[in-house]
């Protein structure tokens, strides 16, 4: 019974079926939004009008289709597929490799008739044939008048490496799903922060209690005044608040600390900071009123009832903003350290900005990379041709034949050069 189960799991057709099933589940996870709120699923997949006739929000939540890649049944499929590859490797591929390493001598001349390439040579030097085969980089094994030769045995390792690479990729995927996390933080300049706003995490994830500080944030612009790049000067702090690592990050250039990646993803303007003639600091919050554009505004009142004042609009981090009155009339621009005369003079001392960070870790990524490395290596090795040649000397005749697993035409040319 156990052997039958092992044979079923090691069967190539069963492995292909599991692979197709995993691919189908991955497609489902791509089509259905992952890790969203229940309200989104209720809106997009209503009970009264099922998508594709079957998808409703309650079924999505019931079967875990809102987090496909972290469900027990998806892990079970990956585990079965990995087990199938392991059994196939040990029960089929390794025994096949061991057989290929053995000296498979032909004992009778009738065996040559099963080969696609074979011939009989009359009055041909046996030593001359062996010399040519040696010159073609074959390994030669001889027992009196019979000879077995092969080359390219390493090419038979390619299927084993394919299995190994797929197992590593699967293991890396599971490790990343169980122990990884992704968080998003919006942090004002000069502020400290901890990882708190978790977007996704695995069942066994331990969120690091790392403290960090945004020392500075700035933006570079092109000649056409569009954003070229934005940067954050970020420091990692220890428990005592002392800096242990510091780096300026930008888009596609993250800070990496203990396997945790800090990516620059977004930016925002938080407020304007003014100083009065009495050195009193006043802050006005900025509101982004457009989802598609980076435009912020604030209301600077000139009376206690907040009924009079000016509107300040800003769309950049170049150090200036525009002033409008209650009727929308443009009054002018104000730059940093410049005074605006309202009921009392105010000096713009700072445009308070914040940086958007995506913080994530995936402990399985190195395992996945190693899996792809072995996959590429197996692809290169698979191009190495595994060829075999058999010879039997009988009286004054030489029976010689060969076979190969690929590049048949090249092998035929090589074979005819040997017997020429």
Swiss-Prot record:
Consequence the record notes for mutating residue 282 to T: In UTEX 646 / Bohlin
Reported impact of residue 65 to F: In UTEX 646 / Bohlin
GO biological process: cytochrome complex assembly
Function: Required during biogenesis of c-type cytochromes (cytochrome c6 and cytochrome f) at the step of heme attachment.
Self-association and partners: May interact with CcsA.
Cited HAMAP family: CytC_Ccs1
Stated name of the protein: Cytochrome c biogenesis protein Ccs1
Lineage, highest ranks first: Eukaryota, Sar, Stramenopiles, Ochrophyta, Bacillariophyta
Recorded name of the encoding gene: ccs1
